[in-house]
Amino acid sequence: MPTEPYIQPMHVLNEAPILCIVGPTGAGKTHLAMSLAEHAKSIGLTIELISMDSALVYRGLDIGSAKPTKAEQDAFIHHLIDIIDPTEVYSAARFANDAKRLCLEIRERGNVPVVVGGTMLYWRAWAHGLSSLPPANSEIRARLDEEGKSIGWPAMHDKLAKVDPETAARLKPNDSQRVQRALEVFEIIGKPMSVLLADSPSEDGREGSAIPSWIDLISLEPRDRKRLHLNLEKRFDEMLTAEFMNEVKALHANTRLHTDLPAIRSVGYRQAWEFLNGEIDAEQMRYKALVATRQLGKRQLTWLRAIEGRKTFDPFNPEELKAALDYCKSNLKK
């Protein structure tokens, strides 16, 4: 198996910290990044945006992922959008490698890298590195998958609890992907994944809740949760009128795609897939998609609030949103 090229650790760079804009889904991260890129252009700088979103990497997942439009992508340079097919898997480790490489290349061109997105596992991998987990073993994975289909994933979760109770305690019984991976790791190395993770230092030796010195983290965190939920509801309904279902139908027609793939498990797509399979009706699809979106936002906020030293702004407060943009502008002058 080919190895990823070595990427120089980012903390050795003797330059201004890299701006990273994060926040829950629907918080306006893309709008802030675009406004900053427009300002940069007006003062003779070129920003290159690096997407930190696990859905945007997939071709064909456009409307449901709120992917920047063609006009937006033409107006500003974007990276890590439409780079793989939905039949493929894009890992956090691959993102970390790609993002570090891009940051170095962008600065070598004399431009400004800005990372923007809300996939927090990608953030952790990029900012702190990941443990040296063994690569996937297709033979073991296929056998575990067949066993899971035969006895059910709750039963597989019980098996995991016997060999790695710590990992099992943080995973839901029906989280087939992660339960399978934990069992796979145990079979490959002969010890629990939790032990390996505990023994693995981050890239710069810091704890996962700290911000590395080479990153300037801007977090958009709405205080009005009700307004955020209403915005998400409005956005989903607008997606439905923007031919989102036709987009999913085109994906559904591809016999190589299924709900075990990360692309199809993306929020909105999974629920639409269930609707096209006849498992739920249209009303249930909308309800389940909105619930899943809210849960995603809650998980993102929980993760963000554990990060010490982040700079927070409420995107629904005009003064704070302006302050966020002003701060980002000042970052360009460093």
UniProtKB/Swiss-Prot annotation:
GO molecular function, one term: tRNA dimethylallyltransferase activity
Interaction with substrate tRNA: annotated segments: 53-56, 177-181
Enzyme Commission no: 2.5.1.75
Catalytic activity: adenosine(37) in tRNA + dimethylallyl diphosphate = N(6)-dimethylallyladenosine(37) in tRNA + diphosphate
Keywords: ATP-binding, Magnesium, Nucleotide-binding, Transferase, tRNA processing
Signal peptide: none
Binding site for ATP: 23-30
Chain positions recorded as substrate binding sites: 25-30
Cofactor(s) annotated in UniProt: Mg(2+)
GO BP term, pick one: tRNA modification
Residues the record marks as site: Interaction with substrate tRNA: 119, 141
Cell inner membrane listed as a keyword: no
Keyword tRNA processing set for record: yes
Disulfide bonds: none
InterPro entries in UniProt: AAA+_ATPase, Dimethylallyltransferase, IPT, P-loop_NTPase
Subunit record text: Monomer.
Function: Catalyzes the transfer of a dimethylallyl group onto the adenine at position 37 in tRNAs that read codons beginning with uridine, leading to the formation of N6-(dimethylallyl)adenosine (i(6)A).
Family: Belongs to the IPP transferase family.
PANTHER family reported for this sequence: TRNA DIMETHYLALLYLTRANSFERASE
Protein name: tRNA dimethylallyltransferase
Species the sequence originates in: Polynucleobacter necessarius subsp. necessarius (strain STIR1)
